[in-house]
Amino acid sequence: TCALPIFYSWVKVHALLPMWALYILSDILYVLVYKVVRYRVKVVRQNMKASFPDKSDTELRRLEREFYHHFADYVVETIKLAHISLEELQRRAFLKNPELVDTLMEKGHTCFILLMGHYGNWEWFSGSTSRFKDSRIYQIYRPLNNQAFDRLFFNLRTKFGSFGIKKQDTVRDVITLKKDKTRCVVILDRKSVV
């Protein structure tokens, strides 16, 4: 449809903004999403109560506000992936002790799984392709229902040379990588677990 090129152009223009400007937009987005539109507030509230049954209502509301601030930051940071250099990305999102993986690979291990939580912006880890010697980076992902967003996220996640594996293909593809002795690091978050 003609809306897709407009949407992609909007993302690319916003990605040109410096991070400080994007974080101002994030603060505006926080107000719109949390206070005005109230996007999934009931669901977030239920999840918070279920996850933290011992916390007071005051503490739960504080966590709820923090969640929406993080969500707004996540949106603008992910948009920035469309126009960020590898050097800047690696300054902002880094892996502690990547040499541990290198050491194990030198001992003959070929495939590693990195399980990442939803802390910070794990989309930014796509720039990790150059952090592991002679290894390919694979990201397990769940295709999104909206094709425009799915295509956008796939392109952003693979921009720096990593490869995407659909969740439903994980077992088959990882077994193939292991059989072929491909030096690989597989990244997934808790929702991608098969």
Regions found by a protein language model. Give the residues of each.
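N-terminal signal-anchor transmembrane helix
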Residues: 28-108
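Hydrophobic alpha-helical segments typical of transmembrane helices
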Residues: 9, 44-47, 125, 152-153
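Soluble catalytic domains of membrane acyltransferases
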Residues: 79-194
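Short, small-residue-biased leader/transition segments that mark boundaries at the very start
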Residues: 1-4
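Dinucleotide-binding Rossmann-like beta1-alpha1 core, especially the glycine-rich loop
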Residues: 7-12, 23-31
